[in-house]
Amino acid sequence: MYESAVREVRTGRELEAAVLRNSARKLQQCRDTWTSEQPADLPEALRINQSIWSILQRELLDEANPLPATLKANLLKLSVIVDRQTLDLVQQPAPEKLDLLVDINLGIAEGLSTQPIGLHVVPSAEVPAYGNEAVCA
């Protein structure tokens, strides 16, 4: 009886994971529908993803943020990669360049999620031009 009245309540971590997954899905749709020209919704998908990461950057830089310093530093490094990849996509659009953004979003969502979605780590040797850090995929 009461089941229809029960509303799903998400924790902050679950909400953040859902937002990252949703953005990853939009980026994947752009990649999957890319023809000889970039999809019309690519700029919006990139803008949304960049906005999400800008908010994350601001939160990570907040002195009141309780996360361990090492974790904050690593997440900030990923945010710089997201910034660079987004700029690269704007300047020289190519569908395969979306993969890194999708992988990062899904990897972070996995870490936030209470229900894992299959995180695996890509060895740094397989991630050219982004330094020696391993990237979650």
How would you label these PLM feature ranges?
Residues 1-62, 72-137:
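N-terminal intrinsically disordered, cationic/polar leader segments
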